[in-house]
């Protein structure tokens, strides 16, 4: 539902479909003239879990998606600290694992998990999931890397 956030160069790229002022929770394949090859998601004040199913349905087979996981919007109110900042490593681990497992349950494969080198405006550590739509879910072995990735993020950014 947001608008005015997309970089000007991307906004003017003919390969990019700009969908401002659109509630992505309702995404359906018929929103697109052809199934997208790629999706990126950076949402606030809503869980990515509410949008992932629509992205999965809309992407073409073989497509990829990069999802920015913001723990402050995934953890639940009881686990978010002062000023909306999540600092707890265990909360980060659980949020990344829960989101990755949800992506797997949706049908995505997990190609890679990493932390964002850029923190959110209030200093929140955020994480990236590279997902694939390949017809068969896979990538559960990547889940074992989550504790190490969270530790690296805290070492670099906390």
Each PLM stretch: what is its role?
Residues 2-50:
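S-adenosyl-L-methionine
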Residues 29, 53-56, 121-134:
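Short, electropositive alpha-helical surface patch
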Residues 71-88:
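Short, glycine-/aromatic-enriched active-site segment of Class I SAM-dependent methyltransferases
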Residues 125-158:
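Flexible, glycine-/basic-rich loop-and-beta segments that form/coincide
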